[in-house]
Amino acid sequence: GQNKEGLYVEMEIQIKDNKIYAPLKDKWLVLKPEEKVRQTYIKRLVDSYGYTISQMDQEIQVSNSQRGQGAARADIVIWRSKEDKEANKCPLIVVECKAESVTIHKEDYYQGMNYASWAHADFFVTTNLKETRIFKVVKGQIPDKLDEIVDIPDSKQADNQKEVDKLLKQ
């Protein structure tokens, strides 16, 4: 992100007393392995892709199901812009995080995929930091299918539909 002088500063991961700071929630959370992955990936989204905290959210309810298993929560959701987020538009990217010790299985993709479908996102990411896989959500099929692609758009591409379409055609 940029500081007040407009200089680039890397986002810091803050950990103390077994808690980790979650900038998207503006609070300290219990330091669980999955939470550490979540905050580290948020840092990557800011530092490497140029997204801002104001266009992301954490643990957001994406399904409208009131069934027994509780509502589905997406770990990290990214909108094209802060304005889109504030207008409650559909997000661009849904990220599902697993603890580093957890091997990601196909079932996990489908769980996250459901979240991405419910949210009407174009991209779905699953990460445990050691392994990050990126998929495009192929819409118009039931169930939506997963096609693995090379990368998600960065913040400049995200707000440009032509660029997004290019990535979706990878």
Spans of model-derived segments:
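A short, conserved, highly charged catalytic patch centered on acidic carboxylates
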Residues: 6-123, 130-170
